[in-house]
Curated annotation (Swiss-Prot):
Location of this chain's protein in the cell: Microsome membrane; Mitochondrion outer membrane; Peroxisome membrane; Endoplasmic reticulum membrane
InterPro entries hit by this protein: AMP-binding_CS, AMP-dep_synth/lig_dom, ANL_N_sf, LC-FACS_euk
Residue positions, PTM Phosphotyrosine: 84
Protein's name according to its UniProt entry: Long-chain-fatty-acid--CoA ligase 1
Function: Catalyzes the conversion of long-chain fatty acids to their active form acyl-CoAs for both synthesis of cellular lipids, and degradation via beta-oxidation. Preferentially uses palmitoleate, oleate and linoleate. Preferentially activates arachidonate than epoxyeicosatrienoic acids (EETs) or hydroxyeicosatrienoic acids (HETEs).
Encoding gene, per UniProt annotation: ACSL1
Residue positions, PTM Phosphoserine: 620
CDD domains referenced in this protein's UniProt entry, alphabetically: LC-FACS_euk (cd05927)
Family: Belongs to the ATP-dependent AMP-binding enzyme family.
EC number(s) from the headed UniProt entry: 6.2.1.3, 6.2.1.15, 6.2.1.24
Amino acid sequence: MQAHELLQYFRLPELVDIRQYVRTLPTNTLMGFGAFAALTTFWYATRPKALKPPCDLSMQSVEVAGSDGARRSTLLDSDEPLVYFYDDVRTLYDVFQRGIQVSNNGPCLGSRKPDQPYEWLSYKQVEDLSECIGSALLQKGFQASPDQFIGIFAQNRPEWVIIEQACFAYSMVVVPLYDTLGADAITYIVNKAELSVIFADKPEKARILLESVENKLTPGLKIIVVMDSYGSELVEQGKKCGVEVISLKAMEGLGRANRRKPKPPEPDDLAVICFTSGTTGNPKGAMITHKNVVSDCSAFVKATEKALVLNASDIHISFLPLAHMYEQLLQCVMLCHGAKIGFFQGDIRLLMDDLKALQPTIFPVVPRLLNRMFDRIFAQANTTVKRWLLDFASKRKEAELRSGIIRNNSVWDKLIFHKIQSSLGGKVRLMVTGAAPVSATVLTFLRAALGCQFYEGYGQTECTAGCSLSVPGDWTAGHVGAPMPCNFIKLVDVEEMNYMAAMGEGEVCVKGPNVFKGYLKDPAKTAEALDKDGWLHTGDIGKWLPNGTLKIIDRKKHIFKLAQGEYIAPEKIENIYVRSEPVAQVFVHGESLQAFLIAIVVPDAESLASWARKRGFEGSFEELCRNKDVKKAILEDMVRIGKDSGLKSFEQVRGIALHPELFSVDNGLLTPTMKAKRPELRNYFRSQIDELYSTIKV
């Protein structure tokens, strides 16, 4: 066959030929083709699309040149950390001024009474009230200076933010107090920060402060401003010990009659003294500047700018304590974009009711809340069929997650997950978790079930809340993301625990404009946290993963040795054991003269009965806690999970004692940030510890 004949043989059909062929097809066939084409077009137009990552997810951080192994975010164009995202936002005063502009004086702060809708103050109203309060402070003789400290002793509410903005407008510094610190710690902070004025939300808190003055423990306190109504006896109690008790309304009136022009702060001025509740000793006052907060806020905006455009229509639910930098940072992000902040009623038991009423788009959480949500969802799947459906649906959505797809409109959302999403108000598009480790199983399931962008961050007060964050598009769990654009992270050797930076493991150290100035009037503690080159030593042990993300694998603090010389990090072990279904809390204990570990275990009151029943045990919660066979079964389950999680044999506990009462702030066994107070736990359970060591033979 000649070449031209071959080409003619394989030629494409002419349009006339196609028309002729189509005319010969039956009508049903043509309709089928049309339907198929329409369906294909519809699928192509509506198919779920993966969120485009802002960087190569296989390389989320890179080494900084000449920095001894420090890594930075690949979202940066150079080896200089990000300080500001918006040119006109350098301080927290600037943050609020920008919020006024971009919201067009929209709603700012909202609150509600029981069974009532939210009522809102506009941005201009908040500015007006804050300037009145700030002017009143000046009229009372306080200085518009970063050396002037103002105490706030209140739950989250609009007045909290108004008073804080008053401080920022006149270059004053906020010192938050919270009742779970305990009376002794509050007294310590009042004296350490030399607080002469404190804003309290309730008369009960004012009485706590007055009693301290009456007992000559806080002689410097001169004014208490009370937000809620109170009786004349409180005023009289104050007069007797030389303290003026005045209402917030009266302060507003005083400031309105003596209005002063704001005196905005500089970026390097102090903004907040955030006292961290240590597990031992007195709390430490972390000195946080305006630049610290704004740089951390800017880094969050930079990291999410392509995936999440925050705007004035967004609504944030405020229930995590404003006394902590985590909530402070998130509110900074919201106010900077003119968003709305709605406050919970003050009772965590009513949070779900508040969520339904507010319908937030932004929902910050902590692992405790996520664990509770996860447990309740699976507790409701109480039949084999329900559990199978839940598992099947979550697996389908988790497969989409691995492809980078985030959505809440799939068939599985409509059939299975819609109720869960509606319980949060039905409009959540962003969730952030931090403050403590979260199980990869819990995080992956809730990312799938809730169908929103769900970021995990890591940090501490001393780096203004966050130093690493998930990158948009990377919805894998088991790590805490890449360095935030405002800071570098490096790992340093911890030889006693056999962690070497050369092997990609070591203590996590942070450097950048978000790192604090030091601890208030405590150079010794400051020197322990900040080295001479400005690196913050976190006390956490991290590991670099191949894609440039950071995984927290251990804890340097609280480590101890067993008799054979093995180093033990109890918090790592506790975080593994609490994954056991019947376990709510664990305190792992060891001693240098003992060769093995033991633990005090608080069973989960909600799940213990059903878990025990499946294994043939019956009885009340207290009876099950006393049952030796139940204790043995719980220990076996803990050891199984420990083995699956890679615990070494010497890291496994050899015996446990069951305790029916939760460790709590009220009984003195937890800090206000829900961390174990290990010395107190040791003393409290001394008899059980001694008994375990005397009865267990290895």
